């Protein structure tokens, strides 16, 4: 769908869709999840904003899909056969997790496309589903002077957790927590912590 979308869009046109993507078991699903989407977008004349709102391991993902597609009404043997088939397929593909979220695209005109599409990847939002103006702002901020004029602010519910080895002046682990919304917790480096706190 994403690869074919630009041919159906006028310059400046947008596409917003829910999406799921497989994350290889060799990658951290919280910090290295965007490679698959990057491959989908490679060479397309679009700017993209991608948000991963949730991550499930293959077993939980399979259970969710079977349950949502009538699993409770299935005979036990049919359920187990479907469940096993999905898990075997994920194992063969080397899938360690499945990311779920949304993708927003804006079709570039010829001049913009010549310089290549811009992409922004986010782990989650501040607890609300993006509306049209959110998507328009996010995609517009990827281009030209707007990018340098963008002022990033920390949501008021974000808190930092620090873990120290007793007697050590520097933290061994930093975790940012979202107090509201989806309640995400994300391990971060000291550089990311400094930027968020600035």
Residue ranges and their predicted role:
Residues 4-5, 89-93, 183:
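Generic recognition of flexible, low-complexity loop/linker segments
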Residues 16-129:
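Substrate-binding/catalytic lobe of Class I Rossmann-like enzymes that use SAM or dcSAM, i.e.
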Residues 110-197:
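Acidic, low-complexity/disordered tracts enriched in E/D and polar residues
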Residues 13-16, 192:
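Generic hydrophobic/packing signal
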Residues 1-11:
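A short glycine-rich, Lys/Arg-flanked "PGG" loop and its adjoining helix->strand segment in the class I
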């Amino acid at each position: 769908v994403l690869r074919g979308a630009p041919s159906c869009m006028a310059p400046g046109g947008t596409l917003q869709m829910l999406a799921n993507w497989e994350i290889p078991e060799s990658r951290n699903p919280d910090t290295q999840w965007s490679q698959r989407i990057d491959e989908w977008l490679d060479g397309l004349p679009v700017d993209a904003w991608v948000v991963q709102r949730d991550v499930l391991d293959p077993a939980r993902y399979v259970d969710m899909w079977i349950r949502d597609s009538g699993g409770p009404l299935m005979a036990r043997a049919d359920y187990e056969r479907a469940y096993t088939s999905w898990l075997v397929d994920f194992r063969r593909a080397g899938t360690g997790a499945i990311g779920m979220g949304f993708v927003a695209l804006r079709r570039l005109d010829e001049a913009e496309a010549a310089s290549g599409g811009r992409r922004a990847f986010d782990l989650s939002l501040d607890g609300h589903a993006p509306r049209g103006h959110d998507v328009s702002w996010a995609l517009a901020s990827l281009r030209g002077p707007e990018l340098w004029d963008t002022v990033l602010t920390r949501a008021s519910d974000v808190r930092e957790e620090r873990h120290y080895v007793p007697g050590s002046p520097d933290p061994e682990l930093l975790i940012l927590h979202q107090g509201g919304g989806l309640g995400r917790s994300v391990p971060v480096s000291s550089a990311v912590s400094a930027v968020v706190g600035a």
